[in-house]
């Protein structure tokens, strides 16, 4: 895709799905990308980014906290500020998915010929009616998260990000319109520590090559880019590819990079709605009734930040930095990490190296048993006598079996708690379409 700020990597491997635990210790199913895989910045506010993790599913609410889980009712009736607050409440690194992140996924799909279909016709795809999801009572045509076929995922496989086209509109952060002027928090800054309030100084205009701010003029059924403030205000919608540009300017490439103007050669029936009066936040994707007008690059800029309705929800994302620990569920923001304990045991000889390897295996068992001092335990293991090692080897097999049983018990308990909390029973075959 020639208009991208960085070259997005074409599909070379299966999407990486990970379970990430928030500060409450509850799991989210996320799809994880390196910055280069999506063409996103590798630095946020002077911190090096290791990975971006995107909610695989439109979020549901459990005890007032958003989670990315399959076969759940998507959370709706959430206004823009509340969506931001809920996502950030999950802990360090968590945020409302930004427009930069959303559009990067869209460009990835376009570049790899996997533009997703979705629930655009009350439980099914308008263009492929054989593609259906699971509707639910009171949903008015909405489907449970991730209940559609793989064609509803951004990469066309079971491992992709689900439901970016249709089902419910989704809030995105880091972009807005102010009296028809598009404004952004640049360089994906809304992903970490940004002030996205109405009066925030972080909002920036987008400029033409001549240095004039860009405005969208909504008038007489058309939406036209121009370098001056519109004379009046209006509300309307047009096909995304039918956005016009006044003859005395060119559409800035930055607008294309942000999915605010169609990239060269892009073709689609997706719609672009805008109200040029006052501040307007952005929704993406369309809903279950938008038909051909829905899609990844579909946009609505018609409502205030306080507006909430049953057709609009959201999904969280999180960012992990280079200095964070190697576990995805640790999103500690401290730049200064504690120095690791130095190992005083050296094993230059053959027998010593074998003991060192045994110590590492015993240390893993110790950590699995929730030991509080794995480094200290490893030193004890390396200093152990042959007789102690022989006894430990016999006991370790029993300990491993106990750990496996405990893990299975904990997993079962989580599943039972989740089922009790949501009161949703997942069946192998569901014919509950409205």
Locations of regions flagged by a protein language model:
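Long, low-complexity, intrinsically disordered segments
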Residues: 426-434
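Short aromatic-cysteine micro-motif
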Residues: 40-164
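Extracellular adhesion/carbohydrate-recognition regions
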Residues: 12, 16-93, 179-224, 280, ...
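N-terminal acidic leader/helix
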Residues: 350-355, 362
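C-terminal, surface-exposed recognition/capping segments
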Residues: 2-4, 15-18, 134-140, 147, ...
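Amphipathic, non-membrane alpha-helical rod segments
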Residues: 384-388, 392
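Charged, low-complexity interaction regions
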Residues: 369-378, 386, 398-402
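Beta-rich interaction/scaffold domains
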Residues: 357, 377, 401-417
